[in-house]
Amino acid sequence: MYNQYQQQPQQPQQFGGQQQFNAQPQSTGYGNFYQQQVPTQGQQQQFSGFQTFSNAGALNQQPTGFSQQTQAQPQQPQQQQPQSQPQQGMQQPFGNQQQQMPLTQQLTGFNSMMPQTSFGQPQQQMPMNTSFNQGMSTTAVNAPTGPLQPQQTGFYSQQQPLEPLKPTATGFINSFANTGVDNTLKIPAIRLSFITTQDQAKFEKLFRSVVTPGSNTITGDQCRNILVKSGLQPHQLAKIWTLSDTNKAGVLLFPEFALAMYLVNSVLQGDSIPYELDSRTKAEVSSFVDAINFSVSNDSEVEQKPKTPFDDLTAGISMMQPQPTGYMPQLSFGSQPQQMQQQQQQQQQQPQQQSFQGLTQQPTGGYGAAPQTSFGNTSQALQPQSTGFMPQNSFNQPLNAQTTGGFSSVLNIPPPGSMPQTSFTQQAPMQTSLATGGGFLQPQATGYLPPSNFQATAPLQAQKTGFGNNDLYTSANLASKFIARKEEAITPEEKSLFYKIFETYDVEKTGNLDSATAVEIFRKSGLNRSDLEHIWNLCDTNNSGNLNKQEFALGMHLVYRRLNGEVLPNTLPPSLIPSSTKILNTVKDQLKQGVDKNNRQPTKEDGLRFRNNDDELLPSSRNRRKTIDQSKKVNENKEKIENLKNLIREKKELLASEKLRLENDSQRKQSENADLLRSIENLKSQIQALPSTSKKSPSANNAVPHDLQSRFDTLTARIPNLFKEISDVSKELVSSQLALHHLKVDHPIRGSGPNCKITELDCKNARQRLTLTAGMCTLVGRPEPNYDNLEAQAQHFNEGIETIEKDDQKNQSAINNISTWIQEISSSVQAIIHGRTPSMGLEMDKWESGIGLEPEVRDFIISWKNRRNFDNSSYNTAGYSNGIQISSSATYRNNARAPEEKDSYSSFQTPEERSAYVKEQAKKKMEEKLAALGIKKKSGSSQSSPNPPQLTQQQQPQQQQQQQQQQQQQQQQQPNYYQQPSQPAAAVNNSNLPKANDDDDEDEEDEEERRLLEQLEKLKLKKKQEKEARLAAKRQTSSSPAETKNDNGHDSWDDEPTPTNPTGNQSQAGSHHQYNPFGKSEATQQKPASGAGTPQLNNTPTGGRNPFFKQAPSQSSSFDLKAAEQQRRVQRGLDDSDGWSDDDETEKVNTTANKAVDVSSTAVPATSTASVPVAPSLPQISATTQEQSSVAVPIAPPLPLVKSESSLIPPPPPLPTSITEGSGAPPVPIAPPLPQINSDVAPAVPVAAPLLKVGGTATLAENEEPKPDDASDVLSIPESVASDEEDKFHTPGAEDVSVAPTGAIPPAPPAPPVPVIPPPPPMP
């Protein structure tokens, strides 16, 4: 039957106040190490009735049983009290009791009592509280008059033989059976503050049920199976796992598992998952994990002792003493047979039935009026004494007090003849009804019920009995529960409060409180000095004089504990020791132990010095035969190695496949990039292949006639001027109307507003003036002026002005509408004619100038535009070059008329031509400025006077005839590949021709340049005439050809040495200096000079003209010291020429021509080479021409005469020329023919006379001393008119070659820079 009393809360034992009854308490439990024999007096005087029941509340609690050591049976007193009460409830009248002997307290219970006894129930004699009818208050309880009956004890020598132990169906619930919980797992008893005690116990039980035996961690799969039942999202569980797995080991220890469960519960309650754990929680979990790790390491170091079947009986109880033999240990917790219990009850109640007859029966065992007893354990009912009545040999012998339930250090041996109390059994319920006085008491069902895991609905099961086989009563369970109950820890609420107090006083945030501050805080509690010193000694664990946060919290906990009346412990329990101190002490112990273990003596021979001992002929048994375990381990290791190898191989394959994929991707990207680049190049080629707009008709729309386009452009250009005139007329009209309005309305106030409006300030000032005038008139006696309607007049005046302004605004709006309408019409017409509108400006600027595009696209657009300009210029100059080749005379005439036809902006008829002209001029100016800065060479423009030299009538026929002969000779003698550069050379446009009369469109800078150039020309002409006069005098006085050597400030390879005897290496040395970069600028300018007679060319090799080449010995001395010195100065850059003077070059031309006339051919070496074809002879040129030209404008010298019988060497290819500053016509790009020489001698190398180059450096005569005025050519010329001729050693180009004009070339746009033509092959 289910016991209704087992669910009642335990009532405080109120019957412990023995002072009122002069009764001594029963000494029970473990608490007494020695028991004193105290004489009992309380049982001689008994109180009757219920007169002392009101004082029951003052009775103190009796320490009974083992209730202070076990937690597994907390409710057993309540369960046992009602069970045994009905048995003692049968009270008999004590009317016939004759002996009233004082009962003496009996010492029951022995050291051999096992913990498996009745807890808190002293099974001793039962004092009865009776009342007498006569009013007397005496007690006759347990004073039997008959013989004592044998008591049921635990001796083997029972009078009645004991039955063997049998399984008894007692109704106990097997709650402690093994349900899969791993109780062997050792988890330190550390309290986690962030979860409650109940949650920690639940999590620990769940952890033990899941953990694998032999391990202290749960795997990720096991944890996942638990956490997924919460219903959270996978990403939330993943984040919880990341926070919980503090060691990143992939497994969870118990504190980490508890943390994970705490986070899951927090999320389920609506909280969010923290991004990172707070420091407090992290520290607690970390310290718990460290404690587990240290405990595991300590347990592994402790040597395991062999286990015995009796270990579980003594686990956790250190006070167990060896038991005396001869006694049967009480194994049954209240499982005696009911028959024996009934017999014992009958035997115990026999003396009570022989009591006094006059005693009135008292109801005992009830709840309503429980009599006062001196041995009461509860406030509910009297406790029966099952075996506490010691049988005596004589009736009058007092009973001795018995100690029950304790293990005493001194064994109290009872008097001889006494039977020791061994049965602390729980009595079975009486199945019979109570006799008297307890009719209202019902029989209670017995059965021990564990209070912790009781399930009321579970079926009753039979319990195992016997010695040491019932795991329900194992001491391990009892001890672990007892320890858990005794553990005292600081609650999280206390910790948080104490930590806040600590942080409040720790103003410096050092983590420590000094002794003065901490003691002052503790002193506020009001405790005495001794308690405070005790608390300080307990909390200052490391004896540092300061307290950290954990030590301060411990001290505050001890302070509050002492204030609550508890006793301070002498030493801290493990649960109160701060975790930091525990970890520090553990580390210290491990270090100490590690030092002792590391001091092992090394073996005599280690593995490195091992040598096989061949004396051992017989192998050891271990090597001959392997055990099964070793083979399994080897196989497992092999399997692990194979698995690792497989994993490595798989990873390698994955890496190889990944690398292959990356390579394929890179190759694919490269191929795609290559395809994109090819497509881009194709687009570029397609764009470049598009026809240029300049090659088309001047108009984008061929259907529109040219005259209509010109008319439209003219009208469009007149529109802005017309609107400007309209605006001016409108302004004049408004001003006239305002003036007329002022004349009509004669108002005395002059307005200061717009259009002379009268403002309020004007009226105010006028009113003040009128007031002053009126005052003056009053003083002088004059009549005051009448200005009453001043405001009305001002308003009328302003209205007239406003009317004029409104009319003007209407007119302006009408004009604006007309302008907008005209612009719309002109835009549509312009779109039809030119293919674009002004609104396309931004887009055109973007794609024409590359604005807002990528750098690559912008560079391509710029390069394409440059190439398009080059193609356009080539296209425009094609017709002009053809015209030059047709007729030289017509070309000259056209060239003569060109400045007159193309000299101004207005001479162009179409807008395209005018825009091309403007662009051409702008490009020329830009190139000139860039050339002045040294950024880029000029492509064809120079900065001398734009006026071409005017030739006399006598020079024109001769020059024309010479040009025709040179062209014919060039066409006959030159190979085809030499004729290729002739067209671009002849097609060089005369870009400077329109510059003579472009004053209308040039700015002030161009005007200043032209003025400077004119002054420069005048100075040069003056100097040139003076020097020519001096040179003519020198030529007349010169006696030898060597004296006419030209010292022009440059290299002397133009100079003609005197005839010398040829040597064998002259023909080879002739081409020695042709690739010298320092001489190309002058070597390319050699042209035939004109003389008085037919000149004879010298066959001296060119090696003689090289200053670095040793001069061949000659018959007459041809070395000129001054010329050599001047040459060296030129090479070193020390000459005085600044490259501006034009007369120097002219002088050089004249002197070279005279020198070429005077030089005669000398002997040549006999080793001649193959002859070359002979060119036709050229006509002789009279000397008067040279004389006139030397004084007048310089011209190109005539070619020398050659003999008909001499063989000619093929002339070098013509070099491209360009227009220089002093030339008005393009130069002739042909070289003069070489003179014929005899077939028996080596052909002489022709020495070409220098071409006419205006602006070259001045030349001096051979023996002429440099004068001071020679260095005065350096003029202060701005950089914008600087020339490139200062670069004396640059690679010669087309702009460095200049000849006299031979014909007129029609003007054309400037050509791009012509590439440098390679020099001719060496002479044979």
UniProtKB/Swiss-Prot annotation:
GO terms for molecular function: actin binding; calcium ion binding. Residues 1-98, 299-427, 593-634, 891-923, 935-1175, 1201-1240, 1259-1324 are annotated as: Disordered. Residues 622-690, 999-1036 form a coiled coil. Component of the PAN1 actin cytoskeleton-regulatory complex required for the internalization of endosomes during actin-coupled endocytosis. The complex links the site of endocytosis to the cell membrane-associated actin cytoskeleton. Mediates uptake of external molecules and vacuolar degradation of plasma membrane proteins. Plays a role in the proper organization of the cell membrane-associated actin cytoskeleton and promotes its destabilization. SUPFAM superfamilies: EF-hand. Component of the PAN1 actin cytoskeleton-regulatory complex. It comes from Kluyveromyces lactis (strain ATCC 8585 / CBS 2359 / DSM 70799 / NBRC 1267 / NRRL Y-1140 / WM37). Residues 998-1008, 1136-1146 have a biased composition (Acidic residues). Residues 232-267, 527-562 form the EF-hand domain. The gene is PAN1. The keyword Protein biosynthesis does not apply. It is found in: Cell membrane; Endosome membrane; Cytoplasm, Cytoskeleton, Actin patch. This is Actin cytoskeleton-regulatory complex protein PAN1. Residues 1226-1235, 1304-1324 have a biased composition (Pro residues). Ca(2+) binds at residues 540, 542, 544, 546, 551.
